[in-house]
């Protein structure tokens, strides 16, 4: 016989009783306390620290490089008998030179500011003429194989010629120092624009030209819709190289032609044995060239071509 045991509803609803004598019961009877969570530290640096690091890495290396240059300059000037002035002496001379950079006491006695402006004017004229001739010539040479085979040997022959070799030709033909200097800038700065533009045209994908041929596009449409957008990064690279070449050439040309210009100013200071002014002119020439390069890079980055930005 099976006997059944019935519990009342009150007994069923009562909570279970745990013995406090057992270890489990003691543990359950004690109040549970949680340890405070450790603060979470982000492994990523903050935006402010990243910005500071970026500025620090952008400023510190150039400053250290300039400091090394000044230190080397000081050591050479102190240990040798070459007559090179020390940095402090050159700095004092620079303060005097730039106290009135635009004075004018005659056609051959002008401040360094007027000389730099005269050189920049010649560079602008010579470079502008070179761009007007060199860029279209580069497109034509790159577009037509016959012209490429025709002019490539001439470019390879004339491009390595020194600027000083072109200057006497300019003096002979133009009968003047200023046109001869502009001619020298023109003939020396035209080659980078021709070569880079032609290379850019030749590297346009052939599929683009095949599509243009299927659509029966005119040469003008091919130039404006296909060639120019594709060649623009190469063209801008050629322009940058040409400006640097033009600025290098004008200094050498003005040393020989005389008149007003930063090259003539350097040569005149050498005749006066003013070495401090020559060193100042070297820094001025470098800074102006750096500014020209920076301006062209900013112009190039206005376009969305990765080749230009890199």
Where are the regions that the model predicts?
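Alpha-helical membrane-protein architecture signal
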Residues: 91, 109, 113, 117, ...
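Periplasmic/extracellular loop-to-transmembrane helix junction in inner-membrane transport proteins
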Residues: 48, 52, 78-128
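Generic hydrophobic transmembrane alpha-helix motif, especially the helices
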Residues: 156-192, 199-200
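Transmembrane alpha-helical segments of polytopic membrane transport and secretion proteins
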Residues: 1-67, 294-310
């Amino acid at each position: 016989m099976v006997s059944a045991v019935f519990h009342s509803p009150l007994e069923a609803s009562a909570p279970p009783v745990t013995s406090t004598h057992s270890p489990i019961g003691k543990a359950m009877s004690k109040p549970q306390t949680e340890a405070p969570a450790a603060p979470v530290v982000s492994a990523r640096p903050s935006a402010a620290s990243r910005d500071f690091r970026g500025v620090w890495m952008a400023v510190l290396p150039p400053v250290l490089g300039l400091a090394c240059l000044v230190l080397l300059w000081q050591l050479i000037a102190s240990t040798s008998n070459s007559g090179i002035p020390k940095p402090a002496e050159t700095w004092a001379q620079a303060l005097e030179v730039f106290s009135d950079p635009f004075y004018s006491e005659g056609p051959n006695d002008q401040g360094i500011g007027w000389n730099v402006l005269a050189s920049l004017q010649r560079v602008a004229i010579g470079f502008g003429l070179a761009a007007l001739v060199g860029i279209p010539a580069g497109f034509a040479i790159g577009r037509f194989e016959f012209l490429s085979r025709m002019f490539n040997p001439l470019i390879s022959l004339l491009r390595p010629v020194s600027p000083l070799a072109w200057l006497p030709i300019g003096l002979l033909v133009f009968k003047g120092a200023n046109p001869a200097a502009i001619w020298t800038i023109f003939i020396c700065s035209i080659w980078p624009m021709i070569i880079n533009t032609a290379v850019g045209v030749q590297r346009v994908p052939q599929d683009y030209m095949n599509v243009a041929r299927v659509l029966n596009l005119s040469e003008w449409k091919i130039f404006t819709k296909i060639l120019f957008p594709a060649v623009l990064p190469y063209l801008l690279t050629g322009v940058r190289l040409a400006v640097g070449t033009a600025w290098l050439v004008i200094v050498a040309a003005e040393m020989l032609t005389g008149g007003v210009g930063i090259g003539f100013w350097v040569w005149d200071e050498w005749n006066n044995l003013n070495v401090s002014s020559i060193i100042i002119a070297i820094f001025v020439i470098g800074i102006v060239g750096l500014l020209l390069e920076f301006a062209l890079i900013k112009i190039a980055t206005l376009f969305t071509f990765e080749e230009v930005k890199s």
